[in-house]
């Protein structure tokens, strides 16, 4: 199965976000003059302490929040609101409870006007990436939390977005399931090569997944660190790996200094 993603780059240039805080009675800057270029097919983790601007930045890229200054472009096209060129996976299981699993995954292609039969085939293709093609006719409430989040990931991918935005998608599952989901995501990424921005509080998760780890502090980029680890990555091989531990320690020290 080859990649279905066009060669497009995400460029964040001098982006700021300011809002009025009624409790403080003044404007507050959540994101300050951030510049970041993400090449097509890169996997970028964004990590930092609570309140550093991670989710605010993701919401501006998604088009959910307007920017206060700067620009965010996919190639030369400015982002002015939500669009099918960006897929979003949230921490909560944001599936339609009245639709089957297959209908959830095929929803994006269906909204693009593709025939139902083709959408059903697309849904099965993407569900097979996470071994869930057998639950296509079930409803979300019949699945475990980990299975629901797998469906959420492939539902976002099935619409072939230029950029996949993931906001702490594995935070609400248990540790063992989280590690399995992380390994599955890296396998999907290697096979499909979508561009991914992954928000997390978890330093080890950020290093395990990414090509680059971006550390945010007080709304600014504190560090943009390349991760030189071979792929494919599995926890069994990396958990005691000296390079992995050294990189995780470097990122953790940056986060603690933020």
Enumerate the language-model features and the residues they cover.
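The feature captures the beta-strand-to-loop junction immediately N-terminal to the Walker
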Residues: 47-49
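Helix-to-loop junction immediately C-terminal to a conserved catalytic motif
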Residues: 62
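Catalytic Walker B motif of ABC-type/P-loop ATPase nucleotide-binding domains
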Residues: 164-167
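Conserved ABC transporter NBD signature motif
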Residues: 70-82
